[in-house]
Amino acid sequence: MLATLTIHLHLPGCGSLKEKRGTIKPLLSRLHREFNVSVAELDLQDAHQQAVIGCAMIGNDAAYLQSALETVRRWVESNWREGEIIEQRIEIYS
């Protein structure tokens, strides 16, 4: 099974793409390191104040994958202060 978490972020403090990269890159590194998920910026690469990031995991237990990605989402929501979540979605493919 493959599980994905897609998060649409609003980055109000970013006035340039360079600032945006400086904000998003540490978040992606931290999620990969702390939660052992694959991460990438998926969309809106040319927008200064928005980003869409994705996290992915594979496994054989849908409930575990759902729970693990919920943990990632909650961490971003509670601990990441550089922006806010506009929308989030978890999908599981079997």
Q: Which positions does each model-derived feature cover?
A:
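Short, charge-patterned binding micro-sites
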Residues: L2, A40-D61, Y93-S94
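Short glycine-/aliphatic-rich beta-strand segments at the starts of folded cytosolic domains
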Residues: A3-G13
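Structural beta->alpha junctions
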Residues: L11-G15, I58-D61
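C-terminal binding/interaction regions
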Residues: K20
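Hydrophobic alpha-helical membrane-association signature
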Residues: T23-L27, A68
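Short beta-strand elements
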Residues: F35-L42, E84-I90
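C-terminal structural segments of small proteins and small subunits
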Residues: M57-S94
